[in-house]
């Protein structure tokens, strides 16, 4: 749960970086029913389909209000257990609106973890079934893609979920190979900003399944596409593009090249995610395992520039490396 929570927090930070100015409105039952009529009469009204899909998820998960950055504010278990929540499930099950399906699916997956955390912090006798919600979320996004296979937005919703299902989710788990098969298909559809924002996900997973040529192509494209330092994803692109190329070099026994890419990754300007959660330490760990302590120590010093919220971890790791011990990088091997 902790790792899933971190993934959701990263998504929240991404949303904030994208500067979504208006919070999503949590609608009443009557308002949702009126919106259903609107969407039925105007199937091309994407904004209404988006709002309806998200509010379907809010009923299923019992979300009564949202706070800053659209995080769960309050829960109402009776809302999730009511007749209208069952109506919502039925509507999702028979919907032919890709927008409603994709938006409800993405919201169900995202908010299920927030609901789990909320229920842990605010225990009540009534529990909301988040497992069923996550399963429905996966199914809904898959159906949206089958209805509109060329819509890139739906693919960007699915890619992070596929990776989570292959890493730490107990909901419809996948092997990394299975996940990469679908991620590669999704990437083949994406263009422009949608593709740019997913390249690091695809590159990291390609390394994991030893598809090194694919990983290199994604990483090179990521670096070449990073031309605007004002873009919220610029720092991530510099970091992960170089990290993946370093991982590939190391797997191909080019240790000096791998070290150069490690140090290049550490020169990133940072990003909302890197500044909060810190860097992925996979390449650093791999180089430590080959005895390359000095390069890793320099890299850790580089990371101090952007990771001010490390709570002493960079120094702790440096001390352990200097003592010839392998640090426990924990969740910094997953980001």
For each feature predicted by the language model, list its residue ranges.
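Amphipathic alpha-helical repeat scaffolds of TPR domains
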Residues: 44-67, 93-123, 149-169, 191-205, ...
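N-terminal leader/linker segments that initiate helical-solenoid repeat arrays
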Residues: 19-75, 79
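Alpha-helical adaptor scaffolds
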Residues: 103-109, 201-276
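Terminal, low-structured helical/coil segments at or just beyond the last alpha-helical repeat
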Residues: 290-335
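Bacterial N-terminal signal peptides that target proteins for export
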Residues: 1-7
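Flexible helix-coil transition and linker loops at the boundaries of alpha-helical arrays
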Residues: 36-48, 84-104, 126-127, 143-154, ...
């Amino acid at each position: 749960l902790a790792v899933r929570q971190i993934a959701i927090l990263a998504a929240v930070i991404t949303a904030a970086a994208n500067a979504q100015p208006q919070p999503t409105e949590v609608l009443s039952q009557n308002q949702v029913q009126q919106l259903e009529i609107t969407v039925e009469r105007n199937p091309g009204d994407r904004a209404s389909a988006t709002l309806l899909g998200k509010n379907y998820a809010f009923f299923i998960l019992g979300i009564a209000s949202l706070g800053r950055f659209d995080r769960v504010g309050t829960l109402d278990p009776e809302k999730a257990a009511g007749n209208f929540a069952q109506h919502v499930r039925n509507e999702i099950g028979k919907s032919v609106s890709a927008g409603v399906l994709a938006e409800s699916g993405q919201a169900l997956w995202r908010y299920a973890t927030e609901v789990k955390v909320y229920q842990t912090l605010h225990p009540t006798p009534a529990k909301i079934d988040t497992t069923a919600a996550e399963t429905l979320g996966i199914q809904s996004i898959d159906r949206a893609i089958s209805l509109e296979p060329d819509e890139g937005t739906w693919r960007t919703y699915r890619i992070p979920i596929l990776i989570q299902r292959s890493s730490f989710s107990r909901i419809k788990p996948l092997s990394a190979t299975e996940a990469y098969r679908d991620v590669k298909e999704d990437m083949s559809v994406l263009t422009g900003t949608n593709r740019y924002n997913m390249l690091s996900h695809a590159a990291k997973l390609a390394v994991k399944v030893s598809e090194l040529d694919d990983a290199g192509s994604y990483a090179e494209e990521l670096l070449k596409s990073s031309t605007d330092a004002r873009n919220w994803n610029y720092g991530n692109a510099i970091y992960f593009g170089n990290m993946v190329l370093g991982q590939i070099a190391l797997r191909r026994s080019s240790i000096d090249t791998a070290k150069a890419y490690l140090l290049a990754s550490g020169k990133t300007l940072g990003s909302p995610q890197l500044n909060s959660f810190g860097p992925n330490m996979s390449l650093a760990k791999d180089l430590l395992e080959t005895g390359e302590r000095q390069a890793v120590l320099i890299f850790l010093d580089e990371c101090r520039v952007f990771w001010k919220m490390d709570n002493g971890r960079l120094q702790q790791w440096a001390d352990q490396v200097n003592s010839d011990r392998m640090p426990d990088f924990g969740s910094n091997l997953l980001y």
